[in-house]
Swiss-Prot record:
Protein name (Swiss-Prot/TrEMBL): Small ribosomal subunit protein bS21
UniProt gene name: rpsU
Pfam families named in the record: Ribosomal_S21
Taxonomic lineage: Bacteria, Pseudomonadati, Pseudomonadota, Betaproteobacteria, Neisseriales
Gene Ontology biological process terms, A to Z: translation
GO molecular function, one term: structural constituent of ribosome
Domain of life: Bacteria
Length: 70
């Protein structure tokens, strides 16, 4: 669990921003949203496979040479 110690004479907003940043770095919020509802194992596998395919095509697209415009 991320924790933030409020420094002396530090505004609350700054401490809150540091806390939000630390939670974002650990990935706690994304995991919480993923675990909010039960996901069947088949659905989870299907979603992960679709994400892998999307990443693969994105990587291929970035490696392709741009078309010549002349």
């Amino acid at each position: 669990m991320p924790s933030v110690r409020v420094k002396e004479n530090e505004p609350f907003e700054v401490a809150m921003r540091r806390f939000k940043r630390s939670i974002e770095k650990t990935g706690l919020l994304t995991e919480l949203r993923a675990r909010e509802f039960y996901e069947k194992p088949t659905t989870e596998r299907k979603r992960k496979k679709a994400a892998a395919v999307k990443r693969h095509y994105k990587r291929l697209r970035s490696q392709m040479l741009p078309p010549k415009l002349y």
